[in-house]
Amino acid sequence: MATTYLTRTSGSPTLNTKYTLSFWVKRSKITYSECFMFDGRVDASNRFKLAFDANDKLGCFNSHSGSDTISFGTNRVFRDTSAWYNIILAVDTTQGTEADRVKLYVNGVQETSFSSTTYPSQNDANNVFNENSSALIIGAYYNATNVFDGLMSYVAFVDGTAELPGIFGETDSTTGEWKIKTTITPSVAWGNNGFLILKNGNSLTDESSNSNNWTLGAGTLTKTEDCPSNVFATMNRASPTTVALASMANGNLYNGDQSPNYWQGIPGTLAASSGKIYWEVKIEGVWGSTSQNTQRHGIADIGAAVDNNTSDAYDIQWTTAAYGIGWCNTSGVRNSGSVTGTSDYSTFIATNVLMFAMDLDNLKLYLGKNGAWENSGDPTSGASGTGAYTIPTAGMWAPYSETKYGSDVISWNCGNGYFRTVAISPAGSPASTPGIFQYQI
């Protein structure tokens, strides 16, 4: 949604003293200018916003006739780009205790630590997001600036009731994780302005009992397989890295358009110590020389990289400890701790799609290109590791890429089924589950 926002004009509310806004959000871009998730406006003196500020704190604001009726900001920050947050704003101005009139929940838990608070007076009915003829926007400020960069899902609004979190999610009895409820049933009713959009896809058609559809204001609304119930890895914007973060885009799955003359490394989110993981890297561009390494793609042991990297970045030191494996564009595969590496892997060029299958149960990494596994590799071979590169040690391993020049441009596909904005077609056959990939293991 980096340039995308949605619009709607509200109708006459069922009850403007009570409402609930619930949504799931996964951030892509962090620690930059204020980014609006929700905006409402009657005029310059009657406004509403729910946004992350430049320091990644969450704030809510409502003004009536130029005076704040709601204003608060969290002390906590929201910088986990691997996570889906369920954020719920519940308003009931009929409550006698002012702190009960506005409640904010994150993943089912009420927020109570705020840098400042302004609560509405009792029975205040000037709530702009649920006011007749308010111009509503999801994903941007009213003038299409301060656009939100990330993913949203299950955006629900209940008019007339301040709901509890259990309407929208529940705690997993085994893991303790807050998980989504894919069937939302308000305790009373949706109310006149109630809606439910972005349910299991990019549809702007209201899937509540109403017909309060939304309209695409600008940009392209892309469906992702990454969702609150099935999270996929991305490049880790929150990690220590020398990558120019401004060049990252498309949900942190694209890295390019940089111009330094030094190595820039970025690890993935969702590092693991066990299990089997598959992902793809498309080489969108390579620096002109065919005799010099300017790209390395593979895996990094996140804990070891942090412990051993004195520059506070993820650029792997290839002459020291063994905490990374990189497939170089001209000279084969290198295990950190070995400068020479292994040359019996093919080179790669622009337009190639690299395949990575990481088997952490057997400490094997399989490398492939354009649908064929290198060294006749067989990712299903288990402990025998047919054609695999041996992962040197157990650890917390994640996908990893390094590039050197501005023309070294790459895209990852960890299951969303896109390289940048281009959908994969045809997808691997049979269809990959979960996720959509160019090739099938």
Task: Name every feature range the model reports, one short phrase each.
Residues 1-17, 54-60, 64-68, 132-135, ...:
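Low-complexity, glycine/proline/serine-rich flexible segments
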Residues 1-3, 22-30, 49-124, 341-344, ...:
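Extracellular glycan-interaction surfaces
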Residues 1-19, 69-79, 141-144, 180-188, ...:
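Short surface loop/edge beta-strand patches of beta-sandwich-type extracellular domains
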Residues 1-5, 96-98, 115-117, 151-212, ...:
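Extended recognition patches within non-cytosolic domains
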Residues 3-61, 96-98, 161-166, 270-274, ...:
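Extracellular glycan-recognition modules
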Residues 21-29, 87-89, 138, 152-156, ...:
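Short hydrophobic/aromatic patches on beta-strands that form ligand-binding or substrate-lining surfaces
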Residues 126-152, 403-404:
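Extracellular glycan-interaction patches encoded by glycine-rich segments
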Residues 296-353:
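Glycine-aromatic-enriched beta-strand/loop faces of beta-sandwich-type recognition domains
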